[in-house]
A protein has these predicted regions:
Chain A
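Long, internal scaffold/assembly segments composed of regular secondary structure
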Residues: 230-330
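Non-catalytic terminal regions of proteins
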Residues: 101, 224-227, 304-509
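Post-HExxH zinc-binding segment in Zn-dependent metallohydrolases
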Residues: 117-185, 284, 288-301, 314-325
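Short pre-active-site segment immediately N-terminal to the catalytic Zn-binding motif
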Residues: 69, 89-106, 274-282
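Auxiliary, metal-adjacent structural segments of Zn-dependent hydrolase domains
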Residues: 3, 11-90, 213, 217-253, ...
Length: 509, 368
């Protein structure tokens, strides 16, 4: 019932689908059952606006997204050919206006995604029943709307969405913090500790320096100071900095129950979508690798060739100021396959200094296919690039790094050096290109202020946005909020106290 | 059934219109709308509709690209188009949204924002006018009004009735008798008539900036009045030492120079009113804009003319004096002397673009 527009594939397409599915299986792809539907552009845009999910809670940004997709399409600026969602079974939507060659290509592409969703480690913790979960979220949200009014809830959703990227994308995979001590436990422990500290023993004055030796007292006093210091460290809250700011707020911000629930929904949905951001290059590369493999070997007819070439090259188009994840992904996978087929890896190859020999290195190992399946299982974009990007590849792909030149307000080509390109690429990919932010202290200045820290990696925050975001953060925390970052190359604390913003250079410790 | 997305889209629509309302002053003060006049809707760019996040700015940012080029070669501005660089093509770029509004919607917003009263027509408020409406059908008429569907329907009916219709070869040939034509009925409707006369000083002391201010203000006044009256007639006068009646387009585009004789405009206005708009039947509005730099001896002539001809018959006579670096700005002083006597005379001094908004309120806030 969830997918209300469901229409079974017409015979022609269902034949193609079965054929493509068989090819995919023959190549060793492994996916959940995949349900295809054909939609017109309006419907497809609608699904896309909701992130692929037919039932989500009401919010204007979905409408905005839809508006943009429809406008982009009618102006001929963009077109969505398909959409797949990571669930079990997988749902895939095809555009009805695709011609038959497009449909073949797209279906083959979809099976690549479905295989990736099922097997890539970064998706292993996602909720495969997310259709139901999303519908539940919608129900909960609608209940809050009934109780508190549309605009009240909408405004609060806006506030939460402003913070939605402040999650920990690795949290499903790593336990970062020890269980937090409850307040009662802390009190019991500190009470015991304060009692155990010693002092002078009673003694006659002439015996005192023997019974209470100066050095021992000194030592005891110093131990006591040490304890006190530790104690105050324990009072610091949270004890370790926390990456998942949103989760921290859910636990500790003074929210009403319904607000906490809204924030939880936003948090859970953001976590669900996080792996897609972490594996964009790999996922699109993998799907493109399979559509091109299957199409060029099995799927093409004479009359479809031009269409295929046109569509495929359109997908692979590069541009100077934006990296195409499809292109980078597929080329890197092809490169890995070739290198492992020829044995171009390992110390012997790495240390070879004869350029001619290196270029014509071929041990005929045939390990390529196996290798890329392994790659798709364990890597995300960052580890993928970090492990497999080579100077030869960068050169062949004409890659360069670019940087913003503040003096003429332009992006300029910065370097074609391998190390620079790689570093820049890893930086851009880190945390999906977003700043990494931690909760450093929730009792800043011992006044219950929230203190966040931006892990500065050379790129400054967009200031006006940061200030607006602080306002939203304050709405939730209800006490002054601060973020430590870098402004004009100086460590700086941006603060908002509920009435006004302030910007202070961080004093030296 | 209302689709989920329609509801979300309507909500979005409401929010951006709210944004426009918030920033209405900015849109009013800047003359961007004028070129779009005549179309049904205007597109207004609405920035910053998105939800703020902690995100990277440009300083220190960069990315990786592919293609030819030397080190140091620019690869385009980062802002504004498509996906932002530095995000490996993942992050959405900044979009400037355009919202489509009709001029009527804008006029309503303006009215609301300025708290303009609805204008109450003077005198006989139930003037009738006659209008032709194409609502009926008749058997004769010109070919251009032939109603194809009705004609062919009748022809088909006739052919079936006479057993001349063969479904396998479905030819239908209408005869003269089958033809039907659209026809109109003349209906009388209650009607309030308004005539607006815009006068603009285009003499040498009026710079382009001043003219721009006048045009912007005239545009918004016009938009508001159009909203208030079903039938509104406009006339445009430009003058330096002599006055000319011009069409709307010319009024919004003309560049002139020369000396200034304001009375020439008044005479022209009087002439137009006598010719086209008998005051008993029309609500008459005059809007005059100048930098107030009149040829000295002409001033008394002007006042005389106003008292004699224009003040007695106008709902409103509005004089907007635009501050100019060259003009003397004296003319308004002359009008101030008679301001008390005539409550349909309204004066406004417009210092700069920012003052347009307030000036509109001064003029239209009376509700006359």
């Amino acid at each position: 019932m969830v997918v209300t527009t469901y229409r079974p594939l017409p015979k022609e397409l269902s034949d193609i689908q079965q054929e493509m599915e068989q090819h995919a299986l023959d190549y060793g792809l492994d996916f959940f059952k995949t349900i295809f539907e054909v939609l017109d552009y309006e419907e497809l845009s609608m699904f896309a606006a909701y992130g692929g999910f037919p039932v989500r809670y009401p919010h204007w940004r979905f409408g905005a997204q839809y508006d943009e997709l429809m406008k982009g399409y009618s102006y001929g600026l963009q077109k969505i050919y398909e959409m797949v969602i990571n669930t079990d079974p997988c749902y895939a939507y095809l555009l009805s206006a695709n011609d038959i060659t497009d449909q073949k290509l797209v279906i083959a592409h979809v099976y690549g995604h479905c295989d990736f969703f099922k097997n890539n480690a970064w998706f292993s913790q996602t909720n495969r029943k997310m259709l139901d979960q999303m519908a539940n979220h919608a129900t909960r949200m609608n209940r809050h709307i009934d109780n508190h009014g549309y605009e009240v809830v909408e405004t609060f959703i806006d506030t939460c969405l402003s913070l939605e990227s402040l999650i920990d994308p690795y949290s499903p995979h790593i336990r970062r913090t020890q269980k937090t001590e409850t307040r009662a436990e802390t009190k019991k422990r500190t009470d015991e500790e304060s009692e155990s500290t010693g002092g002078r023993f009673p003694a006659k004055y002439y015996m005192d320096r023997y019974i209470n030796p100066e050095e021992v007292l000194e030592e005891e006093a110093s131990q006591k100071r040490q304890k006190a210091r530790e104690l105050s460290d324990q009072m610091k809250f949270p004890k370790e900095r926390m990456r998942d700011v949103l989760y921290f707020l859910i636990q500790y911000a003074p929210l009403e129950d319904w607000q906490r629930d809204v924030l939880t929904i936003i948090h859970d949905e953001a976590c669900y979508f996080a792996p897609q951001g972490q594996t964009k290059i790999m996922n699109e590369g993998w799907a493109s690798f399979w559509h091109s493999t299957i199409m060029t070997r099995h799927g093409l007819t004479d009359e479809g060739l031009i269409n295929y070439a046109d569509h495929h090259s359109g997908t692979m188009a590069t541009s100077p100021n934006r990296l195409n994840p499809y292109k980078l992904g597929i080329e890197l996978l092809k490169d890995i396959e070739e290198r492992w087929n020829k044995g171009q890896f390992g110390p012997e190859y790495e240390n070879c200094t004869d350029m001619y020999q290196k270029e014509h290195w071929d041990q005929d190992l045939g390990l390529g296919r196996e290798k890329i399946f392994e790659v798709r299982r364990i890597h995300n974009d960052i580890t993928f690039i970090d492990t497999f990007l080579t100077p030869e590849f960068c050169y062949k792909q004409k890659m360069f790094s670019f940087a913003y030149n503040d003096s003429n307000k332009t992006y300029e080509i910065q370097s074609r050096e391998f190390q620079q390109i790689k570093q820049q690429l890893l930086n851009s990919l880190s945390n999906h290109g977003r700043p990494v932010i931690y909760v450093q202290d929730a009792n800043y200045k011992n006044r219950g202020e929230l203190y966040l820290e931006h892990e500065y990696l050379g790129v400054e925050l967009k200031l006006d946005y940061a200030q607006d975001t602080l306002v939203n953060l304050h709405t939730i925390w209800k006490r002054p909020v601060n973020i430590e970052t870098v402004v004009d190359d100086r460590p700086t604390i941006l603060s908002y106290d509920g009435k006004k913003h302030s910007t202070n250079s961080k004093e030296k410790n | 059934m209302v689709r989920r997305i329609d509801r979300d889209q309507q909500r979005f629509d409401k929010i951006i219109k709210g944004k426009v309302r918030q920033q209405l002053r900015k849109y009013i003060n800047h003359g961007e709308m004028i070129g779009r006049k005549g179309r049904e809707t205007v597109s207004i760019p609405v920035p910053n509709i998105e939800i703020p996040h902690f995100q990277h700015g440009e300083k220190g940012s960069g990315g990786v690209g592919q293609g030819e080029g030397e080190v140091g070669q620019p690869i385009g501005r980062g802002k504004g188009e498509g996906d932002g660089p530095g995000q490996a093509g993942n992050e959405r770029g900044q979009h400037i949204r355009e919202v489509e509004l009709t001029l009527e919607e804008l006029a309503d917003m303006l009215g609301e924002a300025l708290e303009l009263p609805r204008i109450e027509p003077k005198g006989e408020d139930a003037l009738t006018s006659q209008k032709d409406r194409y609502t009926s059908i008749r058997p004769t008429g010109p070919d251009s009004l032939r109603h194809f569907k009705r004609t062919y329907k009748r022809a088909l009916r006739r052919m079936i009735a006479t057993n001349n219709y063969d479904p396998k070869d479905p030819f239908i040939v209408p005869t003269k008798d089958d033809e039907r034509f659209r026809s109109w009925k003349t209906v009388t409707e209650p009607h309030t008539n308004a005539a607006v006369i815009y006068m603009m000083d285009v003499s040498g002391s009026m710079t382009d900036v001043q003219k721009e201010i006048v045009r912007t203000e005239a545009f918004w006044i016009d938009t508001w009045l159009k909203r208030q009256y079903d039938g509104i007639e406009r006339r445009y006068i430009v003058h330096d030492a002599v006055a000319h009646e011009v069409d709307e387009d010319t009024f919004y585009r003309i560049r002139e120079s020369g000396g200034t004789r304001i009375s020439s405009a008044y005479r022209a206005a009087d002439h137009i009113i006598k010719r086209d708009f008998p005051p008993s039947q029309w609500n008459i509005y005059c809007f005059q804009f100048s930098d107030g730099d009149n040829w000295g001896e002409d001033n008394s002539d002007c006042i005389e003319n106003l008292k004699q001809n224009l003040f007695p018959i106008c709902n409103l006579f509005c004089y907007g004096q635009v501050r100019s670096p060259y003009g003397s700005g004296d003319f308004i002083k002359e009008l101030r002397k008679v301001e008390e006597e005539f409550d349909n005379l309204i004066l406004s001094e417009i210092d700069d673009k920012e003052a347009i908004y307030g000036s509109i309120k001064t003029f239209l806030g009376t509700g006359k």
